């Protein structure tokens, strides 16, 4: 699941529970369209990619470098040989904004049907996630409290 800085879901992919998240990161980043605040077509790439330690892979960092995205991913705490050159910088204040996606997942799981996974088929579960994300977008853009 990918969301913007306001917690609005942009796109998602369904995968098996045993599948690693890093395998689905690049296809998810390729299909995203970020709506722009002005007129014109939506952007295809984000400025920052905030992710947890599970996404710490060299091929994802190279992908971010190729498309001029700044990865804000903490390094895994495993024994690793230091690479030559400058070490990658880690922006801790920016990384604290990652709680936005965690709050969005918490909000999504408040929907009982999604949290308990009542649906047997992936197609019907994906439809319920799409419906919940649509409701989230509509509440954000058309709230009565504004």
Task: List the predicted regions and their residue ranges.
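Active-site beta-loop-alpha junctions of metal-dependent nucleic acid enzymes
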Residues: 13-38
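Short, acidic, Ser/Thr-enriched surface-loop or helix-capping motifs
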Residues: 4
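Charged phosphate-binding loop/patch that engages nucleotide di/tri-phosphates or the phosphate backbone
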Residues: 128-146
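Membrane-interface transmembrane-helix boundary segments in multi-pass integral membrane proteins
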Residues: 121-125, 129
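Residue-level signal for inorganic ion chemistry
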Residues: 25, 52, 131
């Amino acid at each position: 699941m990918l969301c913007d800085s306001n917690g609005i879901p942009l796109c998602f992919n369904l995968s098996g529970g045993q599948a690693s998240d890093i395998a689905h990161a690049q296809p998810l980043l390729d299909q995203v369209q970020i709506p722009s605040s002005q007129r014109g077509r939506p952007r295809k790439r984000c400025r920052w990619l905030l992710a947890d330690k599970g996404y710490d892979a060299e091929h994802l960092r190279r992908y971010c470098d190729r498309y001029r995205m700044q990865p804000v991913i903490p390094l895994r705490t495993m024994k690793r040989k230091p690479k030559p050159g400058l070490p990658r910088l880690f922006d801790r204040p920016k990384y604290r904004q990652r709680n936005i996606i965690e709050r969005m997942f918490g909000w999504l799981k408040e929907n009982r049907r999604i949290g308990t996974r009542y649906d047997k088929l992936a197609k019907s579960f994906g439809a319920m996630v799409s419906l919940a994300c649509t409701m989230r977008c509509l509440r954000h853009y058309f709230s009565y409290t504004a």
